[in-house]
Amino acid sequence: MNNKRTFFQYVIPSVLSFALSGVYAIVDGFFVGNSIGDAGLSAINIAYPITAVLQSVGTGIGMGGSVKYSILKAAGNEKKAREFVAGATWLMLLFSAVLTVTVFFTSEKILSALGASGELLTLGNEYIKVIALGAILQVFGTGLVPFMRNYGGSLWAMIAMICGFATNVALDYTFVWVLGRGMYGAALATIIGQGVTMAVALVYCAIKKNLTLKIAPVDTPKTAFQILKIGLAPFGLTLAPNISLVIINRFSVYYGGQEAIATYACISYIICIVYLLLQGVGDGSQPLMSQFCGAGEEKSLKQTKTLAYEFSMVLAVISAILIYLLRGKIGLLFGSSAEVNAGVIKVMPIFLVAVPFDAITRVSTAAFYATEKSVLSYVLTFIEPIIMLVLMLMLPPVFGGQITIWWSAVFAKVITASVSIVLSVRYSAQRNR
């Protein structure tokens, strides 16, 4: 098998799919920002982590189930592999129901905890109520895509995402600009777009005859535990930019106010697309790494990891250069004020420093959960926000204000990447013994 050709057949569609998933948030920000202004943009920025939780739950469950599916199938245990498809489907149904009820009835309290108040709270609550009602569409829209990739359907996974994205854009234009439905319209466009992705994914899985709910009751708890054990890392990795968003927003409220929040809203919309591109490399190569792990093909596994690191670094550098050159247009894209746009021009280069380091971390994390090294993937996933929080508590009072909030986020990524290199080298040495 030509590993390089196969690698890109899996990874390119995955990268494009993740890019589109990042653009979902940008679409809402673009239409709302140009319709309502800085207040609407800030409200979307504060509320979006809740949406991200729903999507990350789907990604985590889907990735956990699909990793086990690929490893077991490669080892020749087709029957057991299908049980993990069923287990993941039941988990997505369960979590969808729980999240719908929880988010809908506690949305105002959650938004307040995220730093929203006054007009931002009102606008954010209008957005999240609708998102909560469409939780099942978000969870399944993101949760079925990893299975499509592991069934060999990376291209169809991309097509599903494109269909959802196109629907989202068309409906955002219609609901927000033409009909003037504001936050409500943006949220409705988002969940319908995810619903279209879910529909395409369901049809594909049904055609492949890999859509099943059949699992022995006695095996259900163990299967669910194994799915969640692996899925916790991709859940956290998908959510990580939004955890950072929450932390940065909370400190920015104190040090920089609404202008700083709006500035980071513009930055985060763009920078998160880059992070998702890099995650697309890791998750796109996951089916191959899981298959090679299950089949005991160590040489092919190593080659796949190397290709993933190289390709993610190339993407990181190219993306950082392009964003730096175009940074003066970013604030204007979202209809921000002149002050906010000036802030974006000044602050964006700081965040671009961290992009190559994030490339290392995301591929390392994906490699760990693809080969069932869950604990190591947890370390890389959750150490970054912890380091960031500690730095933001320590540095601003000593060195001064909002600028150290920005740099704390960068330092956290540099430290996490350093840890990922150490863990990856040690893990590779253990496998080669």
Residue ranges and their predicted role:
Residues 1-14, 69-136, 178-232, 289-354, ...:
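Short alpha-helical transmembrane segments in multi-pass integral membrane proteins
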Residues 2-36, 49-64, 68, 93-100, ...:
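N-terminal transmembrane alpha-helices
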Residues 23-42, 111-118, 174-181, 242-269, ...:
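Helix-terminus/linker motif at the lipid-water interface of multi-pass membrane proteins
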Residues 62, 131-149, 157-168, 186-201, ...:
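Short runs within selected transmembrane alpha-helices of multi-pass transporters and secretion channels
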Residues 26-30, 101, 143-147, 169-174, ...:
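Alpha-helical transmembrane segments of multipass membrane proteins
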Residues 14, 18, 30, 34, ...:
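Transmembrane alpha-helix boundary and packing residues in multipass membrane permease domains
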Residues 41-101, 138-157, 263-325, 358-372, ...:
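Small-residue-rich hydrophobic transmembrane alpha-helices
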Residues 9-28, 130, 141, 164, ...:
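Transmembrane helical elements of multi-pass membrane transporters/channels
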